[in-house]
């Protein structure tokens, strides 16, 4: 099943997404269609000495060597050994990774507004979830795939996010930034790196809806928000309101249209960049390049 030719009919800024639903044990999970390159039958895996316990090994696919991560192992579930098991070939954070899952069933279209933030769940699963979708009698978990990769690589001594601060610059200290990011891990990394570089005046929000309401409150007493906000940095995938919808609303409003908006997301690829352009994003940078983000922010606010 190839999703490279699958036509994503959603327009940018509609605050909707399409997810591929799959099973791991008794639970149903989902992944954004935009992250999925194709879904294949499991193939022979070459084990790698001293690899992480959740990494099954490597496979060769169309001339590329790709790592295989078992979501059975990651979520503490025994593999089913079923002929229905699948490999989901994904692309995000400028890399390709294969996830070993159970059966893959169908694609669902849902609104980000309907996706709830995870609360405390059994076995601490909420640490690796970005949201929960309730569909009639079914609950679908949305894993935080970036955090899964980060945790595995951190255990192996790998610096996923290439943390190399550009150094402190006094000119950055009076600039007001807004960060919109639902991942606590990414929010912390972004804040730490930006503050170390001199960007101390930061307002942060975990979804686009909260950020938009905050910005519109500022707009009540201001005709040009660019005097109060120097730049907005937003993720795309977030419950309640995604980054594309947030960007579209801000650019359509005369009071906020001049505020630079940078999309910082694992979904920034050559194939998907146009979706940010359509809604008016001033800049788009792919995770995990935080150092590149700081350089680009500088070009908008201090240079």
UniProtKB/Swiss-Prot annotation:
InterPro entries: Chemotax_regulator_CheV (IPR024181), CheW-like_dom_sf (IPR036061), CheW-lke_dom (IPR002545), CheY-like_superfamily (IPR011006), Sig_transdc_resp-reg_receiver (IPR001789). It comes from the Bacteria. Phosphorylated by CheA. Residues 176-302 form the Response regulatory domain. SMART domains: CheW, REC. GO terms for biological process: chemotaxis; phosphorelay signal transduction system. Residues 16-154 form the CheW-like domain. The keyword Cytoplasm does not apply. PROSITE patterns: CHEW, RESPONSE_REGULATORY. It holds the Pfam family CheW. Keywords: Chemotaxis, Phosphoprotein. The modification 4-aspartylphosphate is found at residue 235. The keyword Phosphoprotein applies. Disruption phenotype: Cells lacking CheV are somewhat reduced in chemotactic proficiency, but a double mutant lacking both CheV and CheW has a strong tumble bias, does not respond to addition of attractant, shows essentially no accumulation in capillary assays, and has greatly reduced methyl turnover on the methyl-accepting chemotaxis proteins (MCPs). Involved in the transmission of sensory signals from the chemoreceptors to the flagellar motors. Chemotaxis involves both a phosphorylation-dependent excitation and a methylation-dependent adaptation. CheV and CheW are involved in the coupling of the methyl-accepting chemoreceptors to the central two-component kinase CheA; they are both necessary for efficient chemotaxis. Moreover, CheA-dependent phosphorylation of CheV is required for adaptation to attractants during B.subtilis chemotaxis. Consists of two domains: an N-terminal CheW-like coupling domain and a C-terminal two-component receiver domain. This is Chemotaxis protein CheV. The lineage of its organism: Bacteria, Bacillati, Bacillota, Bacilli, Bacillales.
